[in-house]
Structure formats: C-alpha cells, structure tokens
Amino acid sequence: METSEELKQRIGDLSYEVTQHAATESPFTGEYDDFFEKGIYVDIVSGEVLFSSLDKFNSGCGWPAFSKPIENRMVINHDDSSYGMRRVEVKSREAGSHLGHVFSDGPKEAGGLRYCINSAALKFIPYEQMEKEGYAQWLTLFDET
C-alpha cells in the first residue's frame, strides 16, 4: 500500500492537498477548466472512471463543470457545512478522494446539476488513448458522437 509521502510524490502537492485534505484549487487556474477535448476524466489517485467530456460544460465558475458522473454509483455525495456554507461534497467511491462539490444550478436540460470539480483531482484520458490506458469498455460512450 502506498504511503502518504509516496502518494504526494506521485500526484504532486496540490493534487494531494485537494484529494486528501479537501483543499480547493484557485478558480480559473486548473488545467481542465477551459478544456473540452474528447475523452474521460478519472480520479488522479486511483484511476477510477468519473466523468465524460460529453457531460462537461462551461459554467464560468472557474473549475471544470459536469452535468453528471458517467454513472451515479461512481461518486459519493455527502453534506458539507465547512466554512459556514451548506454544500454537497463529491468524493470518488473507491479512493474516497475529495473531488469538489455538486450544486443544483446546472443546465436544466441536462438534469439541473453542476458538478464543480477540482482539476487537481482529475486525470484526463484522451479518447484516442482510452484503450491503451485500460479504459476500452468506456469507448461506447462516444458511439453516437
């Protein structure tokens, strides 16, 4: 099993603070905020599949925004009252990584949710690399596009 120090070395200081200590990267600074390539987003810690580029939208909030996870079972939501706010925190199911928060101000036509996710918690797998990286079963997500 990987130690905290090994994990920090593998994913970097910011990703470690975000995923392990629920830190938040500064708005408009994340690698995937203004990024709309075709592919999937996985947990930077565990590699578990989380979001698809098909569900990503520009919310203007300063962080990557998704209307939904690829499958609801892939994330865990729970109430977060830190910093005097009432929010719903989003974590990855397997690794328990802090990803961000979900809000009810997303596109109505896509279900009304906005998953506001830290870039530092994610790793993007380009569509062309999905099979090589071990994510071939998710290629069918893009069959109709």
From Swiss-Prot:
One of its GO terms (molecular function) is peptide-methionine (R)-S-oxide reductase activity. The keyword Secreted does not apply. Signal peptide: none annotated. Gene3D superfamilies: Peptide methionine sulfoxide reductase. The active site is at 116 (nucleophile). One of its GO terms (cellular component) is cytoplasm. Its EC number is 1.8.4.12. Keywords: Oxidoreductase. InterPro entries: Met_Sox_Rdtase_MsrB, Met_Sox_Rdtase_MsrB_dom, Mss4-like_sf. PANTHER family: METHIONINE SULFOXIDE REDUCTASE (PTHR10173), PEPTIDE METHIONINE SULFOXIDE REDUCTASE MSRA_MSRB (PTHR10173:SF59). NCBIfam families: peptide-methionine (R)-S-oxide reductase MsrB (TIGR00357). Belongs to the MsrB Met sulfoxide reductase family. This is Peptide methionine sulfoxide reductase MsrB.
